[in-house]
Every structure is written in C-alpha cells, then in structure tokens.
C-alpha cells in the first residue's frame, strides 16, 4: 500500500509530457495574444498580464490538476525565467524564479494540486509576478535594464506608469481577477474532469 502511494507521487513520462506540452501551448498563446494587443502601449503596460492570465487560466488549471503532483507551478515559472533571461536579460531570471518558488510554496500540503482554490492561488501569484516584471525593471534592476540598450522612450514610459501608484494598483488589481474567473467558471467541470483524469479510469 505504501509502495503504491509512493509510486503515485513519482513523476512519469506522461506527467513530464503534459507539463511540457501545456507550457509550450501557453507560451504560444501568450505570444499571439501579446502580438495582437501590442499596438496599444497603455494596454501593454497596464492590462497585458491581466488579459493573459484570464486567457491562460484554464490551461494552467488543467495542467496542474491533470498532473496532480507538486512541481507544475515551479516548472511553468522556470520556463518564463529562462525566456525572460533570453529576451529581456539575465537580471530578470531571479524575478521569475522567485515568483515560481513562492507559487510552488503556496501549493504545500497533501492533494493541493487537486484543490481548485489552491491552484487558483498559485496562478494569481504567477500572474502578479508577470504583471510586476516591468515594474521591477524600473524599481530594482534599472541599471541592468538600461545596459540592455533599451530606448530612452521605453524607459520614460515605464517610469511614467510604474512610479504612479494609481497605475501600479490598477495593473495589480485587474490581474487578480483571474482568480475569481477560475473559481466561478471551472469548478463546475472539475468533478466531471476528475473522473476522466483518474489513474483507475
């Protein structure tokens, strides 16, 4: 019995494949979404992360509950840490990695990855980390950010929005909405999906 329980907590090739596929899909969806909405600078600065969190929430919840084991929240954020390091600069890696660790810590405890509320909490942490990454470039990593060769105009725009409390609070507040979305729209399907995800099905 104990051996069976232990085996059930181990990652399988299928688990790794699910995480890999869903991370790739979420990355592609995010890039398409950002490309389509990138024309509006104000939207990109304030609402991009909120819209992405809303769109990607079902993918994230399905991935976490399908695997049902500790790790998906951290792995997803590690993916973004690597992407951010390549696209924005190595200085952003600790930001996303730290967010991933916090998100994964929020999932401590038995069966957390089968609890829609716990999964939702980890998702909003992840979304807030993304929403605040542009702020962190101005608040904490300004010198490293400038060293990447970013235009003065970009720095001025980010400084304008991310040093104004009302815009900072607006961006973070609207990003938290996906938690409510996840609670209200996904739980109705969880019991049906669980039977399909069961290893004994």
Segments the model singles out, each with a brief description of its role:
Residues 131-155:
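Juxtamembrane non-transmembrane "cap" segments at the membrane-aqueous interface
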Residues 14-22, 48, 52, 71-76, ...:
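Alpha-helical transmembrane segments of integral membrane proteins
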Residues 159-181:
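Hydrophobic alpha-helical transmembrane segments
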Residues 22, 26-30, 56, 60, ...:
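Alpha-helical transmembrane segments of multipass membrane proteins
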Residues 2-71, 75:
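Hydrophobic transmembrane alpha-helices
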């Amino acid at each position: 019995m104990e051996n069976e329980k232990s085996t059930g907590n181990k990652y399988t090739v299928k688990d790794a494949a699910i995480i890999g596929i869903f991370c790739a899909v979420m990355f592609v969806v995010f890039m398409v979404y950002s490309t389509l909405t990138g024309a509006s600078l104000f939207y990109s600065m304030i609402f991009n992360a909120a819209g992405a969190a809303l769109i990607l929430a079902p993918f994230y919840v399905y991935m976490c509950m399908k695997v049902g084991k500790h790790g998906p929240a951290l792995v997803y954020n590690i993916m973004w840490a690597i992407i951010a390091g390549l696209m924005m600069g190595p200085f952003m890696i600790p930001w996303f990695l730290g967010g991933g660790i916090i998100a994964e810590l929020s999932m401590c405890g038995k069966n957390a990855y089968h609890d829609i509320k716990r999964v939702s909490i980890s998702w909003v942490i992840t979304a807030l980390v993304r929403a605040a990454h542009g702020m962190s470039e101005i608040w904490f990593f300004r010198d490293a950010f400038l060293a990447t060769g970013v235009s003065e105009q970009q720095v001025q725009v980010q400084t304008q929005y991310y040093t104004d409390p009302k815009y900072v609070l607006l961006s973070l507040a609207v990003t938290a909405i996906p938690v409510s979305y996840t609670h209200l729209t996904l739980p109705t399907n969880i019991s049906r999906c669980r039977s399909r995800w069961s290893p004994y099905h």
